[in-house]
């Protein structure tokens, strides 16, 4: 789950990270009121109007504008709200802007990068800093990796004071700015760890001419599997920013990710799902989705899975690959039969059932009047996919 910038900034502020004052707005009038409030309470004379979508590269796409007056805020808000903002992370269709953040402007002397993420190779948390702030850290890592400094934090020990100082030194800071950077690093790490984040990022973290350290942007990704421990964060979820098909799948307890291929697949277990996608590619097709029905597959979830997959007009064949451990194959087969009664399955259907009650499941399918192709081995399933695509 991703947070909007304004939500991430609010979270960071709770952990002592200095963040410029800002107010979120959903209408032009609300944006103007926000600017006037910042003008009155903070003596702000410079404003930044920022589109709130779950994607980077907003500035290059026209979603971040500088305003020197309240009237300019009105003009920019009118242009940004409702626009389909296209960035390198949204795809060509873009994302509709429904909210903007109006913040007071900050004079910038130097930009830095600060981020915390999970390093799966070491099973530790990695904190990264760079003097190349304000640009994609991936670009810096590729072109100038020596400009990124990292420390790894063992979760069983926690972040040590010498590590925060090491990072602040790597940023080239001294004096009060050094102390503020140490506090920002400590606060960001605590926010990351205590809220089960997979990523907490400030890009850029800036130093003002007066030597203050401010987080002028913020990004947070949360671990979906830990959201039950953070109901306050789960309430921040913005379904408008997520794939509607994936949201619908989640409502049925299905793990679904849309892909660009032509073969739909329904599988139980993430490992088997990835192996199935490999099989589809070897067969000459491209997977149209990742769909894991999990360990509690029922007739209802199978039918929901079929509906979701078949909504994709690019699907030319459908492979159902089930290994029955906790899942009973006869229950899945019954789900297929029930789904076929309620849905027009107008593409070739290949079914592979192995494991618990597989023979009973095959019997149910054989005795039904469904037009489908059965497979026992993965290779057979691949051959059937090849044949189905060749007939199209």
From Swiss-Prot:
Q: Which residues bind ATP?
A: 50, 57-59, 106, 111
Taxonomic lineage per UniProt?
Bacteria, Pseudomonadati, Rhodothermota, Rhodothermia, Rhodothermales
Top-level EC class as recorded in UniProt: ligase
One Gene Ontology biological process:
tricarboxylic acid cycle
Q: Does the keyword Ligase apply?
A: yes
Q: Which cofactor does it need?
A: Mg(2+)
EC number, as in UniProt: 6.2.1.5
Listed GO CC annotations: cytosol; succinate-CoA ligase complex
Name the source organism: Salinibacter ruber (strain DSM 13855 / M31)
What is the documented function of this protein?
Succinyl-CoA synthetase functions in the citric acid cycle (TCA), coupling the hydrolysis of succinyl-CoA to the synthesis of either ATP or GTP and thus represents the only step of substrate-level phosphorylation in the TCA. The beta subunit provides nucleotide specificity of the enzyme and binds the substrate succinate, while the binding sites for coenzyme A and phosphate are found in the alpha subunit.
**What's this protein's name?**
Succinate--CoA ligase [ADP-forming] subunit beta
